[in-house]
Amino acid sequence: MEKNRLSIGHLTTCYHSNFILMQNDDLKTQLNTEIEWKMFGTGPEMVAAFRNNELDIGYMGLPPAIIGIEKDVKIKCVAGGHVEGTIMCAKKKYKGDIQLDNNVFEVLSQFKGSTIGVPAKGSIHDVILSFFIEKYNFQNEIEVINYQQPEIIALDMKSNKLEGGVGTPCLAVFAETLLESHLVIGAENLWDNSPSYGIFFHEDLIEKHPNYVLEFLAFHKKSTTLVRQSPDVAAKMIAETVEMANEEYIKKVLSISPKYCIALSNGYVTSTMEFVEALHRLGYIKRKLVIEDIFNFRFVEKIHPENHHYLIN
């Protein structure tokens, strides 16, 4: 028996390919069901919705999902979407990674005695920042504030409550519209192949309606390919869905971190398991998950049998 409605969760981040798929009536027709799109401010909020059986499908980063799975939330990552979607921006008085030989320690050292904003505890951005704060023993020298609404980070940078922010490419572009700021750490220099988002399905849906997984991933592949191959076209489509951002704004966001694909590549999976180690060491999880706890490969291997496209030519 088919479901009458599928609830799909997505984040506010305008570089995710869901904003293209949200315009496609063919998805509803192909799946022969109503589609309900639900927006969340952070990944941990989406995990809570999965726990409460309010979602069937979700676009989110791997760390909050790992935290949820370890706490018995019944979800599996069935496909990738994008890697290296975390950046750090700051006021222009701070030197960037290019000026400092891509040395993250040197960049962060500039913020001793200052405060940095980052999205919610357990988000991929929070975990990456926590990893480096611990690695360089900056726990008592750099204050970190977590935000449930990531957009507020840029506003607090403008009001001088924060000196910098860690988050999505959207944060960097939004901050530039409000104050004299720039990227101080690019996405490629924070965490190699960091799985900024993947596609998660509730295990109940995978078990009872595996056809939905295959059909959804076919559409996901098309939208992701469009972002990768035709970013200008994608930017126009996304701008039509995201009313708060214009086409040029979206183009700039997409250019900061352009590594899109749906494959679960070796790099994607390896990076995810590195996050498992970091999450365990930092105290976010008590048990180290294994690959099978997180991923279900059988669907994406049918839809995307070719090599991955996360590498930039």
What is each stretch, according to the model?
Residues I152-E240:
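Pocket-lining segment of extracytoplasmic ligand-binding domains
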Residues L279-N313:
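Conserved C-terminal helix/tail region of periplasmic/extracytoplasmic solute-binding proteins
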Residues H209-K286:
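Secondary-structure end/capping motifs
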Residues Q30, K135-Y136, L178, T241, ...:
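Alpha-helical structural context
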Residues E2-Y136, V144, E163, P169, ...:
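Short, glycine-/small- and polar/acidic-enriched structural segments
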